[in-house]
């Protein structure tokens, strides 16, 4: 695990990966450990797909500005192939069969998505 994980922003983490000072797997280990520690109190992450992210780290991520950086996607209207989409609503439970354009673009940057975060229902704030 990479103990200095919280001392860097996404560009700093990507720079460390590109220099070979830390691996995408080590960053993911750190992100998963923090999520496991903090999420029970926060309920911020509602869908986890750690195994998929570990497979991606092992197989190799696209080369981009954020290669190897762990990422959490907001569960609004962003389809991530093979993962659920609820938009924060109990009335919506879509199993995504494609990546939305924003997800395609994020993947192209090399981020390693390992979950989806909570949102108010349909993203509405009253």
PLM ranges: what are they?
Residues 12-13, 60, 101-102:
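Residues within well-ordered alpha-helices
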């Amino acid at each position: 695990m990479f103990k200095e994980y919280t001392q860097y922003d996404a560009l700093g983490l990507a720079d460390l990966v590109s220099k070979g000072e830390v691996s995408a797997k080590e960053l993911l280990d750190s992100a998963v450990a923090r999520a496991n520690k903090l999420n029970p109190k926060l309920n911020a992450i509602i869908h986890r797909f750690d195994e998929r992210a570990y497979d991606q780290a092992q197989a190799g991520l696209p080369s981009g500005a954020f290669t190897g950086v762990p990422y959490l996607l907001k569960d609004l209207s962003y389809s991530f192939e093979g993962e659920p989409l609820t938009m924060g609503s109990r009335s919506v439970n879509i199993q995504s069969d494609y990546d939305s354009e924003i997800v395609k673009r994020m993947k192209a940057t090399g981020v390693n998505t390992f979950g989806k975060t909570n949102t108010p229902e349909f993203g509405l704030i009253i």
